[in-house]
UniProtKB/Swiss-Prot annotation:
Keywords: Antibiotic resistance, Methyltransferase, Plasmid, RNA-binding, S-adenosyl-L-methionine, Transferase. This is rRNA adenine N-6-methyltransferase. It comes from the Bacteria. This protein produces a dimethylation of the adenine residue at position 2085 in 23S rRNA, resulting in reduced affinity between ribosomes and macrolide-lincosamide-streptogramin B antibiotics. The gene is ermM. It comes from Staphylococcus epidermidis. The keyword Methyltransferase applies.
Length: 244
């Protein structure tokens, strides 16, 4: 995505009072190394450097990079990189967390990038509230792919009045906690196939009628419109047993 389009999609939070309210929901300590996605004008970056060991801010807008550096002139535990987060290569040999107030229009791309291309153990993001709810919806393929790798929580609402320019909708702070992948490497392709057939309701392509009924019963599913991720995993495991 080019710099111009990202600029037009950015909404900033600059009030220290509002930033402090958001920061109370983020678990950080003086040993943490943080990658910040989009430093903006440096308001969150300033709070992060005061709480953490080291902050690497990744900002595509070179003018905002300078603004952030100027705001943090009294600190030395940070760096600002003028890069596109979607092209950035996260380190594979160190422990870190990620924070970002990310653009609405590339939220899916950013989350896919940081879940599957980074090893961050905790990820905190400010995203549009409706989008956050969709990440918890087991009828959506993207949610099912994410849930296999991370636990997803909505931590708090972030009212639209916190931002400037003010967006049309409210946002929320979410946390993605890394866990041991629920899908083995050898089953990834099979899981991807199962997810896509399931969300498209192509049940006959993954189960016979008897297999389907038995799998639902084993998973304790009474309503196909209301299933947990654990129940979905039970269905997938049944599918694997039937297709050895």
């Amino acid at each position: 995505m080019n710099e111009k389009n990202i600029k037009h999609s950015q909404n900033f939070i600059t009030s220290k009072h509002n930033i402090d309210k958001i920061m109370t929901n983020i678990r950080l300590n003086e040993h943490d190394n943080i990658f910040e996605i989009g430093s903006g004008k440096g308001h969150f970056t300033l709070e992060l450097v005061q709480r953490c060991n080291f902050v690497t801010a990744i900002e595509i807008d070179h003018k905002l990079c300078k603004t952030t550096e100027n705001k943090l002139v009294d600190h030395d535990n940070f760096q600002v990189l003028n890069k596109d987060i979607l092209q950035f290569k996260f380190p594979k040999n160190q422990s870190y967390k990620i924070f970002g107030n990310i653009p609405y229009n590339i939220s899916t791309d950013i989350i896919r990038k940081i879940v599957f291309d980074s090893i961050a153990d905790e990820i905190y993001l400010i995203v549009e509230y409706g989008f956050a709810k969709r990440l918890l919806n087991t009828k959506r393929s993207f949610a099912l792919f994410l849930m296999a790798e991370v636990d997803i929580s909505i931590l708090s609402m972030v009212p639209r009045e916190y931002f400037h320019p003010k967006p049309k909708v409210n946002s929320s702070l979410i946390r993605l906690n890394r866990k041991k992948s629920r899908i083995s490497h050898k089953d990834k392709q099979k899981y991807n196939y199962f997810v896509m057939k399931w969300v498209n309701k192509e049940y006959k392509k993954i189960f016979t009628k008897n297999q389907f009924n038995n799998s639902l019963k084993h998973a304790g599913i009474d309503d196909l419109n209301n299933i947990s991720f654990e129940q979905f995993l039970s269905l997938f495991n049944s599918y694997k047993l039937f297709n050895k």
